[in-house]
Amino acid sequence: MEPEALETCPYNPHHRIPLSRFQYHLASCRRKNPKKAKKMASCKYNACHVVPIKKLEEHEAACVNKSTMEEEDSLSPLKVSLPNAGQKGNRNASPVSPRLPNPDLWNVDSTNCHPMFVLKSFIPQKLVCESDTRESETDDHNPIPDCPRRRSSDRESEPPAEDTSLLKA
């Protein structure tokens, strides 16, 4: 088994981290070094590329992951930009050409015109426990008339008995 490639931490050059753990280490080291973190910025093409803010534009122009992001952007579904108000009067302006989706993307709907899902308001209904229903049925058909069963709902509705012995004193 080959050893995994090690990356150098931008917050502390003495830290050498395996690539598989690098994102976790960056988050941890960023929290532990807030002063240094204020001077650093993440690349928009790869969050593991953390560079000084002054060198960010230079890095993003030459970033190795830039081409990957541009390819993914070209594979995105149909995008149409509407002309702005300044272009409405200009008839010589070229028509807006929508970006067509890649035909290899079979799991994306090409029309992309689904109605927006809106959750309708929830109306709560009275919930009934099955055991309560069975208990009330057995109360109605009690085979022993000498021993009437009381439902727990009957006990809750009765007011508590008052102790009048304390009132006489």
From Swiss-Prot:
GO molecular function of the protein, one example?
protein-containing complex binding
Concerning SUPFAM superfamilies, the annotation shows: beta-beta-alpha zinc fingers
Residues annotated for Zn(2+) 1 binding in this entry: C9, H15, H25, C29
> What Pfam families does its record include?
zf-U11-48K (PF05253)
What ranges does the record give for the region Disordered, renumbered to this chain? 67-103, 131-169
Q: Where are the zinc fingers (CHHC U11-48K-type)?
A: 6-33, 40-67
Binding, Zn(2+) 2: C43, H49, H59, C63
UniProt keywords, alphabetically? Metal-binding, Repeat, Zinc, Zinc-finger
Please name the InterPro entries in this protein's record.
Answer: TRM13/UPF0224_CHHC_Znf_dom, UPF0224_FAM112_RNA_Proc, Znf_C2H2_sf
Q: What is this protein called?
A: Gametocyte-specific factor 1-like
Q: Which organism is it from?
A: Bos taurus
